[in-house]
Curated annotation (Swiss-Prot):
Name of the protein: Large ribosomal subunit protein uL1c
Superkingdom of source: Eukaryota
Gene3D superfamilies documented for this protein: 3.30.190.20, 3.40.50.790
One GO cellular component, as annotated: large ribosomal subunit
Subcellular location: Plastid, Chloroplast
Lineage, uppermost ranks: Eukaryota, Rhodophyta, Florideophyceae, Rhodymeniophycidae, Gracilariales
CDD domains for this protein: Ribosomal_L1
Family from the record: Belongs to the universal ribosomal protein uL1 family.
Residues in the signal sequence: none
Organism in which the protein naturally occurs: Gracilaria tenuistipitata var. liui (Red alga)
Keyword Glycoprotein: no
Length: 235
């Protein structure tokens, strides 16, 4: 078992054992416990009653966080012809066609999101082993294969993010930075909750939400009361 630092152990003592916190109480506590010298990311970890080995229990979609993620997104676009100018004028940081595909083959990965037009996907398929493990492979489900570059680029720049369950049926989602005020973090968290409920897979049976915890990058995990979260509870 990994040994906890004295700093982390001290923070952990400030979380009441067996208590399920209201969303706002948890967010306030998370911010108050932060004592590092950089701006931490706020993360939520949600255990769902899904078994991802079944096709009808997969959960992968996108959501637009109203208050953004707090992260400056570097967006790359693979396209060609007249779409190249469209991508550049819409704010893409990197734009290319076959030339960019070749650069990625050689190791270029200085971007956070890769968007592509459908006509480039056959060429991009050869990058699967490079992009797949890093979660950068464009796909229609992730909203990153599109003809509508203008809207897609602007949305990802503004705070749109993709989330999907891991092999254990757990979601791990960043929903802001600790320099956000509590109200803005709460709005983003509720937006995530509504998206997860709205996109419940058809094959989901029994209890859908099993547990919810939030934490900052270097902070301890704080358990949330699921019902208060799903009722859009405001103290």
């Amino acid at each position: 078992m990994k040994k906890r630092s004295r700093r982390f152990s001290t923070l952990l003592k400030q979380i009441e054992a067996d208590k399920l916190y209201s969303p706002l109480d948890a967010l306030n506590l998370m911010k108050n416990l932060s004592n590092v010298k950089f701006i931490e990311t706020a993360e939520v970890h949600i255990v769902l009653g899904l078994d991802p080995k079944y096709a009808d229990q997969q959960l992968r979609t996108t959501v637009m966080l109203p208050k953004g993620t707090g992260k400056i997104m570097r967006v790359a676009v693979i396209t060609q012809n007249n779409k190249t100018h469209e991508a550049k004028s819409s704010g893409a940081d990197i734009v290319g066609g076959e030339d960019l595909i070749d650069e990625i083959k050689k190791g270029r990965l200085d971007f956070d999101k890769l968007i592509a037009t459908p006509d480039m996907m056959m060429s991009i398929a050869k990058l699967g082993k490079i992009l797949g493990p890093k979660g950068l492979m464009p796909s229609p489900k992730a909203g990153t294969v599109t003809h509508n570059l203008i809207t897609t680029i602007k949305e990802f720049k503004a705070g749109k993010l993709e989330y999907k369950i891991d092999r254990s049926g757990i979601l791990h989602i960043p929903f802001g930075k600790l320099n956000f005020n509590v109200e803005d973090l709460h709005i983003n968290l509720i937006t995530l909750q509504e998206s997860i409920d709205r996109n419940r897979p058809q094959g989901s049976k029994g209890k859908y939400w099993k547990s919810v915890h939030i934490n900052s990058t270097m902070g301890p995990s704080i358990p949330l009361d699921i019902q208060l979260l799903r009722n859009n509870y405001v103290l």
